[in-house]
Amino acid sequence: MFNRFNKLQAALALVLYSQSALGQYYTSSSIASNSSTAVSSTSSGSVSISSSIELTSSTSDVSSSLTELTSSFTEVSSSIAPSTSSSEVSSSITSSGSSVSGSSSITSSGSSVSSSSPYDERFNSLDLSVHVSAGFSAGVSVGLEPSATTASVTTTLSPYDERVNLIELGVYVSDMRAHLVEYLLFQAAHSTEPHPTEIAAAFLDHGDFTTRLTGISGDEVTRMITGVPWYSTRLKPAISEALAKDGIYTAIPTSTSTTSDTYISSSSPSQVTSSAEPTTVSGVTSSVEPTRSSQVTSSAEPTTVSEITSSAEPLSSSKATTSAESISSNQITISSELIVSSVITSSSEIPSSIEVLTSSGISSSVEPTSLVGPSSDESISSTESLSATSTPLAVSSTVVTSSTDSVSPNIPFSEISSSPESSTAITSGSSSATESGSSVSGSTSATESGSSASGSSSATESGSSVSGSTSATESGSASSVPSSSGSVTESGSSSSASESSITQSGTASGSSVSSTSGSVTQSGSSVSGSSASSAPGISSSIPQSTSSASTASGSITSGTLTSITSGSSSATESGSSVSGSSSATESGSSVSGSTSATESGSSVSGSTSATESGSSASGSSSATESGSSVSGSTSATESGSSVSGSTSATESGSSASGSSSATESGSASSVPSSSGSVTESGSSSSASESSITQSGTASGSSASSTSGSVTQSGSSVSGSSASSAPGISSSIPQSTSSASTASGSITSGTLTSITSGSSSATESGSSASGSSSATESGSSVSGSTSATESGSSVSGSTSATESGSSASGSSSATESGSSVSGSTSATESGSSASGSSSATESGSASSVPSSSGSVTESGSSSSASESSITQSGTASGSSASSTSGSVTQSGSSVSGSSASSTSGSVTQSGSSVSGSSASSAPGISSSIPQSTSSASTASGSITSGTLTSITSSASSASATASNSLSSSDGTIYLPTTTISGDLTLTGKVIATEGVVVAAGAKLTLLDGDKYSFSADLKVYGDLLVKKSKETYPGTEFDISGENFDVTGNFNAEESAATSASIYSFTPSSFDNSGDISLSLSKSKKGEVTFSPYSNSGAFSFSNAILNGGSVSGLQRRDDTEGSVNNGEINLDNGSTYVIVEPVSGKGTVNIISGNLYLHYPDTFTGQTVVFKGEGVLAVDPTESNTTPIPVVGYTGENQIAITADVTALSYDSATGVLTATQGNSQFSFSIGTGFSSSGFNVSEGTFAGAYAYYLNYGGVVASSATPSSTSTTSGATNSTSGSTSFGASVTGSTASTSFGASVTGSTASTLISGSPSVYTTTLTYATTTSTVVVSCSETTDSNGNVYTITTTVPCSSTTATITSCDETGCHVTTSTGTVATETVSSKSYTTVTVTHCDNNGCNTKTVTSEAPEATTTTVSPKTYTTATVTQCDDNGCSTKTVTSECPEETSATTTSPKSYTTVTVTHCDDNGCNTKTVTSEAPEATTTTVSPKTYTTATVTQCDDNGCSTKTVTSECPEETSATTTSPKSYTTVTVTHCDDNGCNTKTVTSEAPEATTTTVSPKTYTTATVTQCDDNGCSTKTVTSEAPKETSETSETSAAPKTYTTATVTQCDDNGCNVKIITSQIPEATSTVTATSASPKSYTTVTSEGSKATSLTTAISKASSAISTYSKSAAPIKTSTGIIVQSEGIAAGLNANTLNALVGIFVLAFFN
């Protein structure tokens, strides 16, 4: 850790600070690093913005998301709240309002400085704003309140200021109280990291404890606070809030001195313009809020219009940075360049996402340079086939030129996602076309590299040119491209991006994959295609469809396509539709003009996507027209073989019959799919169109089909927006959502006016034809849009059938109104999409998995075709065409197109243009938004909401081949998702939007170590958590959203986990009517925490500790906040359910093999406890339960325990109610009739680490007993089942030979009639077996040893008790005194009988221990001492006998056996006399020069009105070592007696006396001061010990003084009497190295809080223990306390406040040392 000076110096050179959590340090970036980020924001008006990004270093994973919202506001407040993670940095910037000028720009770069102090980082990440003046205009300030003109006052303090430390420590101690269990578990795993004793004092003080926290160094504060795993999730926000509440602003000072200053700054909205370009930390005002752990992105909300708040997160040096541009409304041009000057390492992924929402009419022209390849200034349109280098992921940061859209490259994993918002103004012409290689002529459509396309709008194809159809564009052959992992991009070749958005990922095989398609669509003036364009995978930026795009015919509002003239071949549509052309794209050979796309050998035709809206598209591309069909010319031609006149695409290899949508490259099959993303592996997934997404499916290279995007709704160009490339693009957003209303009435997204005519998709009414969806890899798809087939063509029919009207075999589709023959994809009449769209299949294209699953139909959605189609993946063998699935469209929507996108998300309900929106590429895109969501209601009936659910349908969203998805970085991000099939997600999963597992579907979460669902999780089918490995860590599963609803099955199986499983179910609403089954870690029981629930199904837990009702600690909830159980809760394999909150209903808790712990039995109502095996029902004596708790199956072997001394026990044979009395409280249990009242007794044991009193039964249960006592022969299974040792109390002493261990199957073989029955069992010792009498009472001691208590039954003359065991057997003495078996043995046993009596009679316990043997060897045998402790009250005396092993002594000669002395203590009161006998070991004579170990015995007696309680504690004396025989250590005994009206209280404390010393250095000494304070309630006396000044010596000795101890007595009195505490602390040893005199150090007063009255728990404290300790600031803390805390399987997590107070002293000792 840096020293303070270094940390302060480092702060001036760092833009970002490192954060530490549990020892994990993240590196921070320094300014000197190679990567940089520029964010520029322009205010409204006509402004030009330029931003550049240079990536000069190899990068690791950088995921950033920048979102800027520009609106009519004049200012933008931007806040950057990046999160940091060890492996990735994802940042998100949001700007709302209008943009703020450059002031918001931030640079963050630099290589990270490792090992920066976690302290600096903590504050930096927390609420630390580095306040600087440089680089900002005078009017800019940071941290202002939302009001634009409001002035704020803050006090600036150093992070090291004691006031800041006190606030932090206050939060820390409060959090410790609220989450006691977590701190206990954490401390157990970090026992070497002690806490300052001040924390202990503050923890114990429930008042104003802050004064106890002074004096703790800043470094110590840092270690404690940042060292816990919940620092960033709980402590950080709480500390930030606490500092803010006190008006404290923290900053790293320039010197080590701590200063504070106050300043007031304000700014007005109009002055927040500045174009500062900060290059150092001082130029940035940041309010950083780093998030913890990897891959967490946070997006900060702008706080006000008037201020610039930027919060920057460090990007690690290895990460690339992003650039964000914000444009406000009005006319703004954006020019952006992305220069990648170095190859991104193959392993790296650079996801970035920029979203800009702008209002009307902005035209932007983007000039992105090639991604992975060399940088260049040429516009993306001119680049086609870049040779990408090996970098697996080509990142196109290009801002797609889409009209308003800004670019939003976002690459969540390996994929690049784009999520532009609806764009408004797109200029036609340039945008769509782009091709590397040759330029496109003015025509809108893309041109292709290779040869240029003539003026016709449509794209040209490289290799051969495509005739005029816009859509098509494709580079030569694509096949070779390997896939980049999830992401869309292709490795191998670069993707040129034909369209602006196209961005081609390298996918095209060698050349670009891209499908121009998207761009194709054209509405009157706008080139939708372009926006759609996005290239396959890559496209991150992609944006919008042209929605607002232009007004055609002037009269048309943006987005409206109505007046478009067919004009350009591809896109033209009369009326509003976009021509199909866009969809088409071709690789390898050219596609003929037809939209649908044709595929040449390998490429997928883009045509698919195209759809037509409104009127038919002109003959040009695919489109057919409703009414009349387009002649063959329209359709594509195919290289390889051409398809005859049918509109639809033709396919090379085999041709598809005319369906436009289909396109496929013959060869394409090879492409492997990339898992996660939709994309295809090998080939790119061009997926040009949004939905299409088709991942790489297209043949090798262009897997993509433009199709999807194509569809057009009346007004918006869906295709374009959809565009996003397949897999990749996740973010993609909207299709023209904003788009506009077409025909006035039509909202964007609506397809209402589309005429079927166009080949690819046309839908009558509103839907787009299926074409878009289809795309195929491998071979061409048959005529029907949807279908495509690899290998051989599928006939149009394939895709399927459509409800409403069926598609003819030809293209599949029929058209409502008039049908287009084979013409491409089918069109759908009214509501249904023709099967085609959904269908797509690649015959051969096995690799392509289908996304299908995801598909779902929106409400009405086209008939089955969709759904069924979804099958898609199933379809021909492998291909996943999935398009279908998503495709479905409800009546109005364009199914085909939308379907197109693989991703299920696509579907859109009527109004929205699903295709486009769906767009997002398949699986990937998690972020994806909605397509048009805002869009509009088309047909009013469907709202964007529909999309949502459909969207993503998991499958599509994540599906890859085999319907499984994994991510290269191990994390899968889910968008809003509905899973309707079987889907497997491998690795960590994070879902920040709603996830639904539909009925009949199954989601399998495989091998992930963490799952987080922070939005709704609804399980109507099956959700399974599984592991495929033999060893794995426990899973962290967190559900914290609004709703957690289970009607199906939620099952987790991980019993072999090597660490504790942690499941947290804390949603706002938790409802289970299905089956939730958790089988968690065995080695350390799993932990389950949940908020109040409503259960009408079943909860089944195995190996779990459950804490219900409170997430923030063991606090009782209000009655209105409890849970309702009307189902079953099953506890098995040691599971313990700790219930703190009220539970009502009419449910059942089945204890199969576990424990139920009730803290408030009176609030446990309507529930029945059923014993189905061994277990414990434990109750805290907090309040009487007015209604008996029904208990079924009680036999005495399964037990009921009260965690306080039971003074009386009674049984009502008429009602079957067993009642235990404790003081004034009663606890009743309805166990049923048939029991004998004389068979009940109470025994002491432990539960959850504390003493408990067990209600036992040893009598006969009548055969007529009620169901509550169904076991006919209680004890039939005998308590001493094999493992239990009869004489367990002997514990380790006879370990290997202990007869107890050899108890053989105990079966109740004998019942003694006529009197309370006892049970006999057979014990085997050596070679002899004996039958003895035992009870069924089994308990556990503080060490976790299980033993059986043997008892006698006074009223039976035939009852016998074990007296001894030896090689001849275990012997009993009958009531007549005769010995049943003669004892012949070298070993002997002693028996101690302890009897406790009350009004119901006496309870006798017999404990057998091995007696010491005489020995003639030179080594004495092990011996044992027995101490008897008796406690008496009005009800009688309770005696306990404890046996401990004596140490062995070693001697060269035979020594005499050890001897013992016995002391008898008698106390008498009105009830009689109580006599105690204590045996202690007497000193042995020794002939050696080493004295043997000795023990001292201290007797402590406490008296009150009920009598006296005496305890005897034996402790080992330390050995002494000397060259000569020295006198043994001696001890002094102090007796303290305090008397009041109630009598006297006497305590005896023994402390070790100082030893003689031969050193010349005196030990440290301490002074003791007694402070007494009195008030009306009495006097309170405190004793404070402080260190005295050290003595110095100029000499140095070789030996040190022995340890000495001081004793402090503290007495506190109140109306109830006085409480005296005696504390012994160790005096530190003197050191012989002292050579200089030092001043007396500061002394501190330590105050102990009131502890509970002495109880038997104090026996758990050995040696000197105390909560009081001294702590010198000039030296390391001196530990003076020790302690023990006993837990049983973590059950202590359930101790309530009352029980916890009794253990707090022990806890403090254990936790803080």
From Swiss-Prot:
Responsible for the thick foam layer formation on the sake mash during the fermentation process. It comes from the Eukaryota. Residues 80-117, 256-327, 359-939, 1582-1603 are annotated as: Disordered. It is found in: Secreted, Cell wall; Membrane. Residues 256-275, 374-939 have a biased composition (Low complexity). The GPI-anchor is attached to the protein in the endoplasmic reticulum and serves to target the protein to the cell surface. There, the glucosamine-inositol phospholipid moiety is cleaved off and the GPI-modified mannoprotein is covalently attached via its lipidless GPI glycan remnant to the 1,6-beta-glucan of the outer cell wall layer. Residues 1693-1713 form a propeptide. Residues 276-327, 359-368 have a biased composition (Polar residues). It is a lipid-anchor; GPI-anchor. One of its GO terms (molecular function) is structural constituent of cell wall. One of its GO terms (cellular component) is fungal-type vacuole. A lipid is attached at residue 1692 (GPI-anchor amidated alanine). Keywords: Cell wall, Cell wall biogenesis/degradation, Glycoprotein, GPI-anchor, Lipoprotein, Membrane, Secreted, Signal. 'Awa' means 'foam' in Japanese. Belongs to the SRP1/TIP1 family. Involved in cell wall organization and biosynthesis. Confers cell surface hydrophobicity (CSH). This is Cell wall protein AWA1.
